[in-house]
Structures are given as C-alpha cells and as structure tokens.
C-alpha cells in the first residue's frame, strides 16, 4: 500500500497533517502559488471545515496557510453550533481579499504574524473571546466598522499601510 507523503510545513513543533499537493512538497493550503491552486484551495478549505464540523472539533488549525482569498461571512463559529469555534491563522498569508462580514466568533481567533496583501473586511462582527492581530502586516485597507470586541483585542506591533476603519467599533475589554 502506497502512502502519500504529508506536507513539509512546520510551525512551533506542529507538523501539517495534509497530503502534498501535486508535485509540491507542500499541501494545497501551504503551497506557495495562490493563483495556481485557487479552485482546489477553496474546495479543500470547504472540505476541511465540513470535516471538522462532522468530527465535532472545537477548532480549525489554519496556521501558515497561503490563502488566495477567504469569504466566511454570516457564519457563527461556536463550540455549540455547527462550525468549530476557535480559529488559528498564525503566520498565514492572505493574497486575496479576506471577508468575514456579520460573523460571530464565540472563542479565540488568532491572526498573529499574518500578512494581508488585499483588503480585509470584518464589518459588523462579534468577537466574544480574545482576538489577536499581533505583529501583522496589513498592506491594504481594513474595515472593522461596527464590530464588537467583548474580550481582549490585540493589534500590537501591527503595521497598517492602508486606511484602518474602526468607526463605531466597540471595545469592551482591553485593546492594544
């Protein structure tokens, strides 16, 4: 029986469990060319989310993913709902747009050390737990208008190169 080799991506001792993509040493999520894999990436991401839902998982680990774009608007991420609550995006690169409009996050969300090449949109979101955008590079506009941060919101050491819109955002706990 031939076993497919796993992705070569490593982060703080974590080994990516996904199979290699085409002739790359990386999986579809860590493959360096976002344009080349766009359709495969979206289908694989939807399958990963569905798999985590069916397992009853409480988190989705997307550390180091190289996103062509991501659209997860109007979703509720909750351990008691259908989508896993905790989202881990550390060190990911977003080459396309990032859209989470009207989403509700019941657990931690971690975007630390991410690079955003295109606009990011988190309008009218609710973060019930800590959210981290530490040490990020945001190269385009970002919109957090009307977003509610119920716990700690950290943007420390983040570089904003475009307009950062926090109009009508509510910070109920510590913001840095």
Where are these regions (language model features)?
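N-terminal leader/targeting and pre-domain segments
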Residues: 1-176
